[in-house]
């Protein structure tokens, strides 16, 4: 399943941008959420629109009973109030915000902003710190209108 590979590539990207990234629960959740988002955004051009928000649907057939089979989803309506203390679950809060940014700004602009923001993450950002870095990157790259859309995506998840 290419989405599994793209998810793992997301971890490699973050570790290259910020060596040692992922020290705390929040930063590990951000890492998992970004990995899921990266799998999503990389699959968009080749998915034909088929349940793009379902991550690793081919791989997860062997270990999930829900239909459709998804390792995780990037479109769940989760907020910080839904945290469970499990980084893969809680990462879906972060990935949903990134998914909303993608839908608001388009793939190329969203990916550029999200990737650029991560250069300003420390090894252990909180959700709020990473979100603010992403808003700041949106402002610098695409202007105030984009920054407001990015901020709203994080506000909708209770992150900002």
Regions found by a protein language model. Name each.
Residues 1-6, 14-160:
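Zinc-dependent metallohydrolase catalytic domains
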Residues 9:
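Active-site neighborhood of glycoside hydrolase catalytic domains
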């Amino acid at each position: 399943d290419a989405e599994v590979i793209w998810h793992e590539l997301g971890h490699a990207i973050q570790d290259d941008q910020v060596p040692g990234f992922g020290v705390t629960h929040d930063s590990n959740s951000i890492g998992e959420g970004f990995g899921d988002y990266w799998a999503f955004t990389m699959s968009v051009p080749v998915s034909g629109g088929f349940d793009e928000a379902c991550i690793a649907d081919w791989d997860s057939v062997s270990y999930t009973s829900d239909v459709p089979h998804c390792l995780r989803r990037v479109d769940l309506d989760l907020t910080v109030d839904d945290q469970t203390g499990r980084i893969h679950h809680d990462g879906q809060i972060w990935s949903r915000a990134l998914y909303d940014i993608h839908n608001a700004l388009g793939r190329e602009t969203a990916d550029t902003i999200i990737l650029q923001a991560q250069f300003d993450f420390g090894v252990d950002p909180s959700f709020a710190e990473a979100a603010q870095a992403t808003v700041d990157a949106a402002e610098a790259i695409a202007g105030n209108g984009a920054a407001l859309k990015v901020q709203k995506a994080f506000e909708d998840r209770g992150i900002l």
